[in-house]
From Swiss-Prot:
Subcellular location: Cytoplasm
Gene Ontology terms describing biological process: tyrosyl-tRNA aminoacylation
Catalyzed chemical reaction(s): tRNA(Tyr) + L-tyrosine + ATP = L-tyrosyl-tRNA(Tyr) + AMP + diphosphate + H(+)
Organism, scientific name: Encephalitozoon cuniculi (strain GB-M1)
Record's GO cellular component terms: cytoplasm
Protein name: Probable tyrosine--tRNA ligase, cytoplasmic
Amino acid sequence: MSVEQKLYLITRNLQEILGEEELKRIVSERELNVYWGTAITGKPHIAYLVPLMKIKDFVDAGCNVKILFADIHGFLDNLKAPIEKVQHRCAYYEKLIKSALKMLCVDLDRIQFVKGSEFQKSERYTMDLYRILSITSKHDAKKAGAEVVRQVENPMVSSLVYPSMQALDEVHLSVDAQFGGVDQRKIFTYARKYLPLLNYEKRIHLMSPMLPGLNSDKMSSSDDLSKIDLMDSKEAIWRKIRKCFCEEGNKDNGLMMIFSHIVFPILQLKGECVRITDRDGREMAFEKYQEFEEEFVRKSIHPGDLKSNAARLIDEIIRPIREEMEKDLDMVREAYN
């Protein structure tokens, strides 16, 4: 694979890159080392498929990929994951994300899976944490986590430590680049400012767009009606989609974004087109999202038909993940009661 082809796979569908020239230099010389981290908090939802599809691109481009299950981060973020539940939820996340990657035809042998607690309690990491905290102001720590850490009027000190640890993870995972959603941007710029003060090099930061919620700006694990969980039943999917805003001819809604960022890319990956059936039984087939969007804007697709087909297609996509997870319901109950 040529350098140009690798760069195309690594950068396609990203919203922003910090350190693009360094990225080009590394890819022209050797394999890129990149990681994606996920804090162990609420149940993963379908928006997780966006970064997981990007991870497939990294693997296909020959990158050395690490996935971090940030168990300590989940506990630090205003107790989103109670300490007694963290390890159970970590097992849940690992099984679920591996199931989703298999659905996306990703070779799991090409990915290294790491728990934060495996290295974040080491003497070297702890001393680095003391060092970075000693030069970080409360203002910078709070600003860095503003889009990621739960914001409360009187935050716990633990939530202010969160961005510093995420910055240090780049060093202690020995990576060239960190990948995340554009909501991570303030943490990324914090890392780029503070790591050089500890005599560590700036890392590259790759950011994907955020998928909006069904009725909100962001799909969130803490807002049940904004999201579709990767384990939701067919009935639960329909119940949530039926309630979401969808005006005839108006493409600015959460459902259309799901078609754009999840349904079309995944079906294209599987070599399938998107088939929409209306209430009269007539079928339309679409190879590209743009064609689909144009038909919706022309009002050729009714919102009711959009919702019913979205529910069907989403169920078809996540069904293999759900079925794999249902083989170990005891693990699910231990993680989320």
